[in-house]
């Protein structure tokens, strides 16, 4: 089965064609990072306008790279949320119109759920059950994936997502946008044990990064106010170590508690080198298999949406054309 995926939830316009949920035939991404860099973050109005300009071109390129036409496609999947509403509407409307015109089944995909499926692209033989940590700029979710389209969300952030904390600390330290890669890079030159930052105890498998973010900002502000010398590299490294330790510890604990000895990480923060190395290390210590997507599939892309769409269509799930963009939506537990 060939599925066309479309992703426009934030500032990447992407289209991909995936075969049987795991084999990528094309994956085209138009990134707006250079446009939004000067503003220190994504400007929603600009993002949606750029999606309108590029969506047709990106979809055409996906077909050209795959050597296919729309007549070869068996279904269409598109992100419906969460994300920026203007951006979401561009890809969702395009997908629904194309589906209607060509009488192809259409399926709306939750962006958070889509990130999970980046692992099934990188590891074609990977199968559930597994523990999944989805960690990105807007979301931090800990999930038990029991089967395709059957999962339990056992933990989520109570406030800021991990990626959001990275972006805000990077902005405060003057490291620019996007913040995650900037902190990852500069932290390599710092002493991660220089500062000890507090971690909020929210119990269970939930997360909280707002207090940590405030503690780092207040600490740096105090150093500046007192005129004390310090290295931004040390702050970045210490902050990063704290975030990573929280994410790794809770994910490992869930794996041990459930005796599901497979862990997969997904989302933009999955590209963080410290997070990847710590997971490899801790999983090896506990005899747990670890999976993480290739770097190019950690950030937003349509291949993961097409993959997720395939598994939905295989289960007979088809969306209505009344499905609308939903900018604020969580991932909720689902039984098949």
Curated annotation (Swiss-Prot):
GO terms for biological process: tRNA threonylcarbamoyladenosine modification. It catalyses: L-threonylcarbamoyladenylate + adenosine(37) in tRNA = N(6)-L-threonylcarbamoyladenosine(37) in tRNA + AMP + H(+). Its EC number is 2.3.1.234. It is found in: Cytoplasm. Its cofactor is Fe(2+). Substrate binds at residues 134-138, 167, 180, 184, 272. Gene3D superfamilies: 3.30.420.40. Belongs to the KAE1 / TsaD family. This is tRNA N6-adenosine threonylcarbamoyltransferase. It comes from Caldicellulosiruptor bescii (strain ATCC BAA-1888 / DSM 6725 / KCTC 15123 / Z-1320) (Anaerocellum thermophilum).
């Amino acid at each position: 089965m060939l599925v066309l995926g479309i992703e426009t939830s934030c500032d990447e316009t992407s289209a991909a064609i995936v075969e049987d949920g795991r084999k990528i035939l094309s994956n085209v991404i138009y990134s707006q990072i250079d446009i939004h860099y000067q503003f220190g973050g994504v400007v929603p109005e600009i993002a949606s306008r750029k999606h309108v300009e590029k969506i047709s071109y990106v979809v055409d390129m996906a077909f050209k790279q795959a050597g296919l036409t729309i007549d070869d496609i068996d279904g269409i999947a598109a992100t419906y949320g969460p994300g920026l509403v203007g951006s979401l509407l561009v890809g969702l409307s395009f997908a629904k119109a194309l589906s209607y015109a060509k009488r192809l089944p259409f399926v709306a995909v939750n962006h958070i759920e889509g990130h999970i499926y980046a692992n099934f692209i990188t590891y074609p033989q990977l199968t559930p059950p597994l523990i999944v940590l989805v960690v990105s700029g807007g979301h931090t979710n800990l999930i038990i994936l029991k089967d395709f389209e059957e999962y339990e969300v056992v933990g989520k952030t109570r406030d800021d997502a991990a990626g959001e904390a990275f972006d805000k600390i990077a902005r405060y330290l003057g490291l620019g946008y996007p913040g995650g890669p900037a902190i990852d890079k500069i932290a390599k030159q710092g002493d991660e044990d220089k500062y000890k930052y507090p971690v909020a105890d929210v119990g269970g498998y939930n997360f909280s990064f707002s207090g940590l973010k405030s503690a780092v900002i207040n600490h740096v502000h105090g150093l500046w106010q007192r005129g004390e010398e310090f290295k931004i590299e040390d702050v970045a490294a210490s902050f990063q170590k704290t975030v990573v330790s929280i994410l790794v510890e809770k994910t490992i604990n869930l794996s041990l508690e459930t005796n599901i000895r497979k862990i997969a990480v997904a989302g933009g923060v999955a590209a963080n080198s410290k997070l990847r190395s710590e997971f490899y290390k801790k999983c090896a210590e506990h005899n747990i298999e670890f999976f993480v997507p290739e770097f190019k599939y950690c950030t937003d892309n349509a291949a993961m949406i097409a993959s997720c769409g395939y598994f939905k269509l295989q289960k007979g799930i088809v969306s209505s054309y009344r499905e609308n963009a939903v900018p604020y939506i969580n991932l909720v537990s689902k039984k098949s």
